[in-house]
């Protein structure tokens, strides 16, 4: 995804995440520094302040693993971060980063079969290399919000809500 003159990428997911982080910061009455203190890995390691502030400024192509740390620190759901206030089904709030990867893989496979495309054709359609497509299809690797938004755009779906769409039947991993 390309940057504009201000260095921002036109990605509604980045905007939704930034909006949610700012809303939560204001609700809690925290400075950016204190907000960043909330974000720690399962091992207790702090998320870098720069990662947090660049995410708030929409200059960071944040990954699902980093978003999981943020969601945990704020006690929010993944869906809450990605949807930016848009209504999503209740089951979507139970998905973690691994479930999101599996849901994305299911959607890609569902759309590929619906369009009757070969794997290489689907990779071409969503604008990724075949090796990347294989990782997406297997729900392996750490996916970024720019990749998710690019896939949604290629499939002509709303980036903020397509992962939680009830129009696409749940896969094995969805609940």
Placement of each model-derived feature along the sequence:
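Recognition helix of helix-turn-helix/homeodomain-like DNA-binding domains
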Residues: 40-62, 127-143
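DNA major-groove recognition helix of helix-turn-helix/homeodomain DNA-binding modules
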Residues: 63-80, 144-161
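Key DNA-contact positions within bacterial/archaeal DNA-binding proteins
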Residues: 33, 50, 79, 120, ...
């Amino acid at each position: 995804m390309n940057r504009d003159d201000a260095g921002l990428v036109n990605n509604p997911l980045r905007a939704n995440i930034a909006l949610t982080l700012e809303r939560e910061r204001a609700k809690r009455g925290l400075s950016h520094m204190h907000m960043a203190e909330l974000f720690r890995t399962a091992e207790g390691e702090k998320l870098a302040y720069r990662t947090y502030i660049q995410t708030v400024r929409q200059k960071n192509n944040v990954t699902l693993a980093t978003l999981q740390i943020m969601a945990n620190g704020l006690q929010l759901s993944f869906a809450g971060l990605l949807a930016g206030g848009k209504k999503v089904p209740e089951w979507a709030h139970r998905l973690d980063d691994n479930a999101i990867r599996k849901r994305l893989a299911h959607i890609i496979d569902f759309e590929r079969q619906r369009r009757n495309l070969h794997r290489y054709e689907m990779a071409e359609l969503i604008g990724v290399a075949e090796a990347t497509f294989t990782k997406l299809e297997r729900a392996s690797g750490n996916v970024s919000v720019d990749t998710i938004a690019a896939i949604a755009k290629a499939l002509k779906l709303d980036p903020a809500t397509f992962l939680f769409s009830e129009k696409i039947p749940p896969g094995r991993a969805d609940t």
